[in-house]
Amino acid sequence: KRLLQDLNIKVNKVIPEGGSVKDLQDLPKAWFNLVPYREIGLMTAIYLEKNFGMPYISITPMGIVDTAEFIRQIEKHVNNLVSNKKFNYEPYIDQQTRFV
């Protein structure tokens, strides 16, 4: 969640973290879905993409390379959805990985 906060991205829902069946009605409100653990949420993400046109990212943000790719995928989806502003997260990636 900290990574998303750093990128000024508001989390709609974390499923199943404390979720209920009622929370499921809010899932289509998200712009895209994050599936950091494919074995848990990939089938749901595929369903939401097929039925609601919601893209998903299934990269696990662990390690420098995968975290950078995870952020680049977020940037791609955000830029596809927001037409009046373009986001560039490369400076953030550089800042987070410069001294590693």
Curated annotation (Swiss-Prot):
Presence of keyword Ligase: no
Reaction catalyzed: chlorophyllide a + oxidized 2[4Fe-4S]-[ferredoxin] + 2 ADP + 2 phosphate = protochlorophyllide a + reduced 2[4Fe-4S]-[ferredoxin] + 2 ATP + 2 H2O
Cofactor(s) essential for the protein: [4Fe-4S] cluster
The protein's Enzyme Commission number: 1.3.7.7
Stretches assigned to coiled coil: none
Pfam name, any one: Oxidored_nitro
Annotated localization: Plastid, Chloroplast
Statement: the UniProt record of this protein carries the keyword Chaperone: no
Gene Ontology molecular function: 4 iron, 4 sulfur cluster binding; ATP binding; metal ion binding; oxidoreductase activity
Family in the record: Belongs to the ChlB/BchB/BchZ family.
Function: Component of the dark-operative protochlorophyllide reductase (DPOR) that uses Mg-ATP and reduced ferredoxin to reduce ring D of protochlorophyllide (Pchlide) to form chlorophyllide a (Chlide). This reaction is light-independent. The NB-protein (ChlN-ChlB) is the catalytic component of the complex.
Oligomeric form and interacting partners: Protochlorophyllide reductase is composed of three subunits; ChlL, ChlN and ChlB. Forms a heterotetramer of two ChlB and two ChlN subunits.
Protein name: Light-independent protochlorophyllide reductase subunit B
Species of the source: Pleurozium schreberi
